[in-house]
Amino acid sequence: MKIILSLIICSQLANTCLDPYTWPEKFDSQYECLTFGYEESLNKMKEIGREEVNEYIVFIKFTCEPVTSAWN
């Protein structure tokens, strides 16, 4: 079974989230998807930067979901 990763960047200050970004590659396991999701979330936080993260109270959430037939 393949797993898809979707990252969602949110601002607690604005009480809103951007549309989910679905990672183009599929993962072979839940573990691979989750560890990659945590790594990419950290990379994105560093890219956004301390100042903007603190100013807009940014947080990132993600999901790892099994691929449905529509994604095959």
What are these regions (language model features)?
Residues N43-N72:
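Short, mixed-charge low-complexity intrinsically disordered segments
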Residues M1-T22:
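Short aromatic-glycine-(Arg/Gly/Cys) micro-motifs in beta-strand/loop hairpins
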Residues T16, W23, E39, A70-W71:
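Secreted/processed peptides and extracellular or luminal domains of membrane proteins
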Residues I4-I8, F27, S41-I48:
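Short amphipathic alpha-helical surface micro-motifs
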